[in-house]
Structures are given as structure tokens and as C-alpha cells.
A protein has these predicted regions:
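A generic structural signal for short
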Residues: 18-19, 106
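A well-ordered secondary-structure block
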Residues: 75-160, 165-168
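Sec-dependent N-terminal signal peptides
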Residues: 3-14
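Short secondary-structure capping/junction motifs at helix and strand boundaries
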Residues: 2-4, 128-129
Length: 170
């Protein structure tokens, strides 16, 4: 009986957070960009991911808004809530919103979305400074997507809200 309870607890704990394929590709593309600048790669951080996921989900509630604020809380509050520690060092949060239409047959949608998000962040002076800061060692990215038909056969609209949280501490 103890073994069954442990297995159930382990499965629930392990599934409490889950990166999507797109989330992983975003981090991969961010590391490719950093590598092109001879910067160290970012290591995945569960705390950064959970903080990013919380903000991305919040952004999806109202597609007309894009903000770093979440009902009076900021990135530090979200990171502390996601982390096992109440202390953190240097934190950064980069956010993006975009909408794209893709053919239903397109097999590279996630790759294209991730590439577009990195380009958006590169073009923003402040977001690029966070993304390319040598102090940053850990990161987690979360992208949420609202999908809708656009009235043209074979095409779908993707409205994306993405957040990446970066930190110098795990």
C-alpha cells in the first residue's frame, strides 16, 4: 500500500509542471542566439518555468493586454512562489505577444513561432539586454496559444503570449 501511495505522489509531483514542445524550442532558440554571441547557455530552471507559465497564463486571459504586472504582483513575487527558496539574485522577465496565420499542413509551426519570439526579444532593447546578460544562467519559457479558424480553408490563426524568466540562481 505504501508503494502505491508513493507512486501516486510521485506521478502527481512529476506532472505538476510540464514544458510543452514549444517551450523547449524557445529555450533552445534562446541558447542558439546566446551561443552566436559567445555567451554561456542557459540551463532549464523549474522555478523560472513555473513563474513564466503563471505570467503567460495570466496574459492569455485578456489578449488585448501585455504586461509584466499580475494583479499587483511582479516577477520577484512569482519567482518566490515558484521556488523552494524565498531568496533570489538577479531576475529578468521578457514577454512577447504575436499573432500568425499558418497552413494546417505546416509541420514547423513551433519552430517558426519560437524563431519569431526570439526575433521580437532581440529587437527590444530592454528584453535583448536581459536575454544576453552574461549574469543569467538559468531560464524557463512558457508560451500559451489561442487557436482559431480564419475563414480560409487550410489556414489557422495562432495568437501567442510568451514569457521567459531568467535568473542567476537556480
Amino acid at each position: 500500500m505504501k508503494a502505491i501511495i508513493y507512486i501516486a505522489f510521485f506521478l502527481i509531483s512529476a506532472s505538476a509542471f510540464a514544458q510543452t514542445a514549444l517551450d523547449s524550442i524557445i529555450l533552445k532558440k534562446a541558447n542558439e542566439y546566446r551561443d552566436s554571441l559567445c555567451l554561456p547557455k542557459l540551463e532549464f530552471s523549474k522555478s523560472c518555468f513555473v513563474a513564466a507559465e503563471s505570467q503567460a497564463a495570466f496574459q492569455m486571459k485578456d489578449l488585448s493586454k501585455i504586461t509584466h504586472d499580475q494583479n499587483g504582483s511582479d516577477i520577484g513575487d512569482r519567482y518566490k512562489k515558484a521556488s523552494s527558496s524565498s531568496r533570489f539574485g538577479y531576475l529578468g522577465e521578457i514577454i512577447a505577444a504575436c499573432g500568425k496565420n499558418f497552413r494546417d499542413s505546416d509541420s514547423l509551426i513551433n519552430e517558426k513561432i519560437a524563431k519569431d519570439l526570439i526575433e521580437i526579444w532581440k529587437k527590444s532593447k530592454d528584453h535583448n539586454a536581459i536575454l544576453t546578460s552574461p549574469r543569467m544562467k538559468y531560464a524557463g519559457a512558457s508560451a500559451m496559444i489561442a487557436v482559431s479558424k480564419i475563414g480560409i480553408r487550410g489556414w489557422t490563426r495562432y495568437d501567442i503570449r510568451a514569457v521567459m524568466v531568467l535568473s542567476d540562481t537556480k
